[in-house]
């Protein structure tokens, strides 16, 4: 092992008692008296509230997103070794880092000392957008590099030993809602020694035509041996004490160093609430633990019995405090034991890397034993026949099998789980077994994310001892363990085990075993997707015995005949697993005509975002006497509010008051939103009208205390004499609960629908489509800070897309003139529409509380509250009738949409135009379109990226698919025959269609075949499907048409005395690169004066500053994908004014000097002449401010028929961006929008309970795309279409339209499922029971896909096999 001999006296000398914590953060020493620390304080709370290191962000508070990831370095003085790994600082308790060193992203490098290569490569690969997740990403990447280079021989110069596969996994636990992950992975891969930089995506370092050496010289330097980052300072090594033993009763945190000391503490604390602490990761799942007031915290990680590791011929024993990551490492060291390797591989899919690094095996098992946690570990270790050692309250040790332990009553508080032992599996035989017996072991899990970071729908682990006989494979013994399906613990299917023991495996035997299994593995009542989970149990059993036959292919009898060929598992080498490496290609043209506009320059502030120095609202230092707020919301859909009280009628710690509608000052109004159709209430008054409606705003002395206290609030309700709430669209229609849509916003007819239907040769009547909702999942939740100012004024810092409307809302709520309010927004950590209307009540509540208490008040809304109160995308139900010719040409379409607006209108009246606009991407002949906007007792829905358009576009695809199915014609032909001609495009879209040259969709349709090899790959897909039973592929290409509107936008450009330039716009930087495009436009426009300074040099002189509603008025909103170009145009107008003022000065200087004039001398002269060097403007689009965007995507997927898992093998996108203002920024928008669309179509299930309260309210229950769920090959071409005089330098929008193209994945999945259903039909002798047309729901989650492939597909297959044999 290379460990040094350890002198026992040395060990004893290191043991010491102490009364303070000593640790380092970014090399700085911190010492805190234990008596001054609340032991429940998390590391992220300390970092953000007590240190200047704000790069650590809070994204979820559950260990599920990675925004708070930091590097922890731990020194072992006995081994003189430093271990370094990432941790989730939102779960790690501050007291547990004693003697450790913490490195944050700004500790790796920053603008003062120089950025780290990780930061610079993230920036250069265009891998940051809103930037809120980027510091955590940076630390994850750095940790991967650090550990790869520590554990391998020195890498070649400039590179790391990190492999490309490891690079992908390095960020697999970090969530990003903006980028689509591809550039982040490429940035990390750029360090890998086995990657060619030229194979990576579009970046700032690699230019066409350059040789490899030139590119490498431009890459930010990385040298693992000379890094300026000191992750563990020397002073800490000198100070560190190996053990900390605290006996004093005055401290609430203790760290015993022996079991006896621990038991003594437990005995002394008899009757008090005690929390044993190791990794503390359980609080991410059991969040009520954070609210519980423990009187004593006992850190048990320094007790040798809990951290011991033993490996010998008996097996591997692991102390209960061994982390999951350490356990994986230990099991992998047992090179010749495949069972342990399989256990380790399965364990790598538990949680994510930074949770596994601190979460312990004992903690995981105890959660299963005490709280019925759906543990993977418990299941696989029961099957591995693991045993546990327990120390009872009487100090005696007992040993049980893990299975026995899990079945016992919950372990009492004074008994301890000491260790867990996995027996040796070196021998392939058991006592008394035949010499020819083979011992087999496999583990299984089905989860929405292949690489983990998601609970399993079902997990399982099987072991079997088998022998080969003349008539087949005999099962001598087996253990079949299932878990995570709603049972209390991992469950052995003993009836199935007993039945199989002694049996020769055959179709008939397996069918009977499956029948028994379905009776035995029954999900508990209330478990989600029970049928799917039961089906998975059958699948895993089937896969296990299928894999068994592959190992014993000599058998000639029964269903084992032919081994893997017959079963069909993985027989095609092209069948890709989700772990396949990502690859990509980009085809981009950088325009030089208006340089630097048109160039793919790095996003403004990208390195600041990566290092974590970019300031978001919650990063602003708290003003003196600052208070903190948390929302109290209703859990009932329609009820009178009788009272607000706390549990046990005891005011929680730190609470200063509760603000309700009664606290609105005289002259103020109870308004929470303003600026759209009607104003929403800030607080419910006498009656709450929906679950999730805000009732009050609790104010406390810290955010932690505010959040805890808000969860302890009890609302007393009364529903007597109230009508039942309206919770469905059908109830809304039945009760005429509808909002009026203004006539200009309603759907409109195109052509004569009656005539179109009469011309049809075929009709499909009354078909239906449904859509659920979607949550924004911006990484930064809603946040605001309100600071009272003199003369009854209020300054509010708001994370908003709509500063002007926030401003108006606050003024109206406080009853003050608008000039008393100032709203400032610098940047937003992701918006997607959710920081428009929904940001207003957050800022208004802070302002109201600040006004009442005359102290600053801020809030950072916790993730659960944010998910429950913000509404999300509009659910809808669609009914359509369509008429068409035999060649597939559609002649008429009638569409009726029921739209769930929720409680208030919000932006819902705008939705019909979006739905219809995107639907009209095809020529429907004649179109009748009508939308009913329904009022329900649910939280008001609002705009979410491509609102209405994404549903409208998909409605079109669903109709096309149904027509194709009806006619038994290739769906691609139906799409093609219904594409618009330019004439029909003008008919449907009027002036928005523009000129003939602007209609590029037919070009894209043909180009995608060449770009992606679409038609050739279709044939390959057909061949694959013909030769594979259990994996089916589908491929589909889908077009999109998206209408956008330009809005008036103000701007100001000021040149300061030193020649530096300040630009101000009211467009908000939310990650879309608005500041970057604005800077490019200013540099180009000012460069037209031609005074010896290039546009690129001018670019470095420009700073875009925060939005301020008193500095610039009439700012409207940042929405609709066009704010970047509108802001750029406003700035261009300003610059033109400045150039006009400067030209006479330049001319005079040239005449005076007779030589060239520099920029600095020109500005100096202008200042001497007192020329106004600040110009304001307001861009006002003319009547041609509307235009259409075009794109097309081809996606290929592979569906696992047995589990419902979908792997996106490849996506190719071609998007017409006009003449892109910045192709690097637009590429990021295209990829990010597409991946967010993937979430809507494939992953993100938005669920409510029977009262309309959102229950998918955490990272545990709501799954956005991750790096392992995006296309394995992801290619994008940005079409550089021609000049268009009515647009800003011929550019087009890119933020929202590409999201619609994610429907190509859904359509491809439908094609794959269709092939699976055809296969089932071929096994059915009477050809009944599986319709060829089906409406695949959105999202097509794993349970949905499996259901449509057939929950009983295994049984049908076996029945068919048995019948085939009988017929022979």
UniProtKB/Swiss-Prot annotation:
The FAD-binding PCMH-type domain covers: 246-427
The species this protein was found in: Arabidopsis thaliana (Mouse-ear cress)
Similarity section? Belongs to the xanthine dehydrogenase family.
Positions of the 2Fe-2S ferredoxin-type domain: 19-108
The cofactor note reads:
Binds 2 [2Fe-2S] clusters.
Primary localization class, coarse: cytoplasm
Any Pfam family from its record, for instance, is Fer2
Q: Give the Gene Ontology MF terms in alphabetical order.
A: 2 iron, 2 sulfur cluster binding; aldehyde oxidase activity; FAD binding; indole-3-acetaldehyde oxidase activity; iron ion binding
Q: Does the keyword Oxidoreductase apply?
A: yes
Which PROSITE patterns does the entry mention?
2FE2S_FER_1, 2FE2S_FER_2, FAD_PCMH
Q: For this protein, what reaction is catalysed?
A: indole-3-acetaldehyde + O2 + H2O = (indol-3-yl)acetate + H2O2 + H(+)
What the protein does? In higher plants aldehyde oxidases (AO) appear to be homo- and heterodimeric assemblies of AO subunits with probably different physiological functions. AO-alpha may be involved in the biosynthesis of auxin, and in biosynthesis of abscisic acid (ABA) in seeds. In vitro, AO-alpha uses heptaldehyde, protocatechualdehyde, benzaldehyde, indole-3-aldehyde (IAld), indole-3-acetaldehyde (IAAld), cinnamaldehyde and citral as substrates; AO-beta uses IAAld, IAld and naphtaldehyde as substrates.
Subunit structure of this entry? Aldehyde oxidases (AO) are homodimers and heterodimers of AO subunits. AO-alpha is an AAO1 homodimer; AO-beta is an AAO1-AAO2 heterodimer.
The broad enzyme category this protein falls into is: oxidoreductase
Q: Which GO terms describe its cellular component?
A: plastid
Notes on how activity is controlled: Strongly inhibited by iodoacetate and potassium cyanide (KCN). Weakly inhibited by 2-mercaptoethanol, dithiothreitol (DTT), menadione, estradiol, 4'-(9-acridinylamino)methanesulfon-m-anisidine (mAMSA), allopurinol and tritonX-100. Not affected by p-chloromercuribenzoate.
Name of encoding gene:
AAO1
Can you say what this protein is called? Indole-3-acetaldehyde oxidase
EC numbers listed for it are: 1.2.3.7
User: What is the annotated localization of this protein?
Assistant: Cytoplasm
Q: Name one GO biological process term.
A: abscisic acid biosynthetic process
Q: How does activity depend on temperature?
A: Optimum temperature is 65 degrees Celsius.
The protein's pH behavior is summarized as: Optimum pH is 8.
Q: Quote the InterPro entries the UniProt record gives.
A: 2Fe-2S-bd, 2Fe-2S-bd_dom_sf, 2Fe-2S_ferredoxin-like_sf, 2Fe-2S_ferredoxin-type, 2Fe2S_fd_BS, Ald_Oxase/Xan_DH_a/b, Ald_Oxase/Xan_DH_a/b_sf, Ald_Oxase/xanthine_DH-like
Positions of [2Fe-2S] cluster binding: 60, 65, 68
Q: In which tissues is it expressed?
A: Predominantly expressed in roots, seedlings, mature siliques and seeds, and to lower extent in stems and rosettes. In seedlings, mostly expressed in lower part of hypocotyls and roots.
């Amino acid at each position: 092992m290379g460990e040094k001999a350890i002198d026992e006296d040395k060990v004893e000398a290191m043991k010491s008692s102490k009364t303070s914590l000593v640790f380092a953060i970014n090399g700085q020493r911190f010492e805190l008296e234990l008596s001054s620390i609340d032991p429940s304080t998390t590391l992220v709370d300390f970092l953000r509230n007590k240190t200047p290191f704000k790069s650590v962000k809070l994204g979820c508070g559950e260990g599920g997103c990675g925004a708070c990831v930091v590097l922890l370095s731990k020194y072992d003085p006995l081994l003189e070794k430093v271990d370094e790994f990432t941790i989730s600082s939102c779960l790690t308790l501050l007291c547990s880092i004693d003697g450790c060193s913490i490195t944050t992203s700004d500790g790796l490098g920053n603008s003062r000392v120089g950025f780290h290569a990780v930061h610079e490569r993230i920036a250069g690969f265009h891998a940051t957008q809103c930037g809120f997740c980027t510091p955590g990403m940076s630390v994850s990447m750095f940790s991967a590099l650090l550990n790869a280079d520590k554990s391998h021989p020195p890498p070649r110069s400039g590179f790391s030993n990190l492999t490309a596969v490891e690079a992908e996994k390095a960020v697999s636990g970090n969530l990003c809602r903006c980028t689509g992950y591809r550039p982040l992975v490429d940035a990390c891969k750029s360090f890998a020694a086995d990657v060619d930089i030229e194979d990576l995506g579009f970046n700032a370092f690699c230019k066409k035509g350059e040789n490899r050496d030139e590119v490498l010289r431009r890459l930010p330097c990385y040298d693992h041996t000379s890094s300026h980052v000191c992750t563990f300072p020397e002073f800490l090594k000198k100070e560190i004490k190996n053990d900390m033993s605290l006996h004093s009763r005055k401290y609430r945190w203790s760290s015993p160093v022996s079991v006896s000391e621990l038991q003594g503490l437990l005995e002394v604390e008899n009757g008090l609430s005690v929390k044993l602490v190791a990794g503390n990761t359980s609080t991410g799942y059991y969040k009520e633990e954070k609210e519980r007031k423990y009187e004593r915290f006992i850190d048990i990680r320094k007790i040798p019995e809990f951290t011991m590791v033993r490996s010998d011929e008996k097996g591997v024993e692991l102390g209960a405090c061994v982390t999951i990551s350490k356990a994986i490492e230990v099991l992998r060291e047992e090179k010749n034991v495949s069972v342990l390797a399989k256990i380790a591989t399965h364990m790598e899919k538990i949680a994510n890397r930074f949770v596994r690094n601190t979460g312990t095996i004992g903690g995981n098992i105890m959660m299963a034993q005490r709280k019925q946690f759906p543990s993977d570990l418990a299941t696989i270790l029961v099957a591995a026949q693991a045993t546990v050692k327990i120390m009872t309250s009487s100090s005696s040790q007992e040993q049980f099998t893990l299975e026995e332990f899990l079945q016992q009553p919950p372990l009492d508080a004074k008994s301890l789980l000491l260790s867990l032992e996995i027996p040796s599996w070196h021998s392939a035989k058991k006592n008394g077994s035949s010499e020819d017996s083979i011992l087999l072991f496999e583990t299984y899990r089905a989860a929405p994310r292949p690489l983990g970071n998601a609970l399993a729908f079902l997990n399982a682990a099987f072991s079997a001892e088998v022998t080969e006989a003349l008539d087949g494979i005999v099962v001598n013994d087996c253990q079949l363990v299932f878990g995570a399906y709603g049972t209390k613990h991992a469950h052995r299917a003993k009836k199935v085990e007993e039945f199989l023991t002694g049996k020769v495996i055959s179709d008939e035997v397996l069918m009977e075993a499956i029948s028994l299994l379905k009776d035995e593995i029954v999900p508990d009542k209330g478990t989600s997707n029970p049928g799917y989970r039961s089906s998975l149990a059958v699948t895993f059993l089937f896969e296990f015995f299928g894999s068994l036959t592959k190992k014993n292919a000599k058998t000639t009898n029964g269903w084992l005949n032919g081994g893997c060929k017959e079963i069909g598992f993985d027989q095609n080498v092209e069948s890709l697993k989700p772990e396949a490496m990502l690859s990509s290609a980009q085809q981009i043209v950088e325009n030089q005509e208006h340089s630097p506009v048109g160039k793919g320059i790095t996003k403004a502030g990208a390195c600041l975002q990566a290092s974590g120095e970019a300031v978001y609202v919650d990063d602003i230092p708290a003003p003196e006497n600052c208070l903190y707020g948390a929302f109290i919301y209703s859990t009932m859909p329609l009820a009178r509010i009788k009272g607000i009280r706390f549990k046990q009628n005891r005011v929680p710690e730190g609470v200063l008051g509760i603000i309700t509608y009664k606290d609105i000052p005289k002259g103020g109004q109870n308004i929470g939103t303003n600026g759209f159709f009607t104003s929403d209430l800030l607080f419910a008054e006498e009656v709450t009208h929906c679950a999730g409606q805000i009732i009050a705003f609790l104010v406390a002395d810290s955010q932690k205390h505010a959040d805890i206290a808000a969860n302890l609030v009890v609302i007393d309700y009364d529903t007597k004499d109230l009508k039942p709430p309206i919770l469905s669209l059908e109830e809304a229609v039945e009760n005429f609960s509808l909002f009026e849509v203004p006539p200009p916003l309603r759907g409109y007819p195109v052509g004569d629908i009656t005539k179109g239907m009469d011309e049809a040769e075929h009709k499909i009547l009354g078909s239906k489509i449904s859509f659920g909702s979607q949550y924004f999942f911006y990484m930064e939740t809603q946040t605001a800070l309100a600071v009272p100012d003199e003369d009854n004024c209020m300054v509010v810092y708001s994370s908003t897309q709509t500063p002007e409307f926030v401003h108006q809302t606050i003024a109206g709520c406080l009853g003050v003139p608008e000039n008393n309010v100032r709203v400032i927004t610098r940047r937003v950590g992701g918006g997607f529409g959710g920081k428009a209307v929904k940001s207003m009540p957050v800022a208004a509540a802070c302002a109201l509380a600040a006004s009442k208490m005359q102290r600053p008040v801020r809030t950072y809304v916790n993730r659960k509250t944010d998910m429950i109160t913000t509404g999300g995308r509009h659910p809808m139900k669609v009914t359509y009738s369509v008429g068409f010719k035999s060649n597939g040409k559609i002649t008429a379409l009638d569409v009726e949409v029921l739209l769930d607006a929720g409680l208030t209108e919000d932006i819902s009246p705008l939705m019909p135009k979006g739905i219809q606009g995107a639907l009209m991407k095809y020529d429907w002949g004649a179109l009748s379109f009508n939308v009913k906007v329904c009022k329900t007792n649910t939280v008001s829905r609002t705009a979410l990226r491509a609102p209405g358009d994404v549903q409208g576009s998909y409605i079109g695809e669903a109709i096309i698919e149904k027509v194709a199915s009806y006619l038994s014609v290739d769906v691609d032909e139906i799409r093609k025959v219904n594409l618009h001609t330019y004439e029909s495009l003008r008919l449907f879209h009027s002036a928005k269609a523009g000129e003939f040259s602007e209609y590029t969709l037919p070009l894209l349709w043909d180009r995608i075949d060449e770009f992606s090899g679409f038609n050739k790959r279709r044939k390959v897909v057909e061949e694959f499907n013909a030769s594979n039973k259990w994996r089916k592929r589908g491929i589909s290409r889908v077009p999109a048409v998206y209408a956008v509107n330009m809005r008036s936008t103000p701007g100001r450009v000021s040149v300061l005395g030193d020649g530096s330039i300040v630009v101000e716009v009211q467009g908000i930087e939310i990650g879309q690169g608005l500041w970057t495009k604005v800077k490019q436009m200013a540099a180009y426009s000012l460069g037209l004066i031609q005074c010896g300074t290039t546009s690129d040099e001018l670019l470095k002189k420009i700073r875009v500053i925060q939005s301020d509603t008193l500095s610039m008025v009439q700012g409207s909103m940042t929405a609709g994908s066009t704010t970047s170009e509108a802001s750029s145009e406003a700035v261009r107008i300003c610059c033109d004014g400045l150039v006009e003022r400067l030209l006479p000065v330049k001319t005079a200087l040239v005449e005076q000097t007779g030589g060239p004039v520099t920029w600095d001398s020109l500005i100096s002269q202008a200042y001497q002449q007192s020329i106004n060097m600040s110009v304001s403007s307001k861009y006002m689009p003319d009547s041609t401010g509307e235009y259409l965007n075009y794109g097309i995507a081809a996606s290929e997927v592979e569906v696992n028929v047995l589990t419902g898992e979908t792997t996106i093998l490849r996506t190719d996108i071609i998007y017409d961006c006009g003449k892109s203002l910045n192709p690097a920024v637009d590429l990021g928008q295209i990829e990010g929008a597409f991946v967010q669309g993937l979430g809507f179509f494939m992953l993100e299930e938005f669920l409510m309970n029977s009262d309309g309260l959102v229950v998918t309210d955490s990272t545990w229950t709501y799954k956005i795309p991750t790096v392992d769920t995006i296309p394995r090959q992801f290619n994008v071409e940005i079409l550089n279409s021609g000049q268009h005089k009515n647009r800003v330098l011929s550019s087009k929008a890119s933020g929202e339209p590409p999201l619609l193209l994610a429907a190509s994945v859904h359509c491809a999945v439908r094609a794959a499922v269709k092939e699976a259903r055809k296969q089932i039909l071929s096994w059915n002798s009477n050809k009944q029971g599986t319709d060829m047309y089906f409406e695949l729901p959105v999202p097509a989650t794993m349970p949905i896909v499996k259901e449509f492939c057939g929950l009983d597909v295994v049984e049908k297959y076996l029945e068919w096999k048995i019948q085939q044999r009988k017929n022979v």
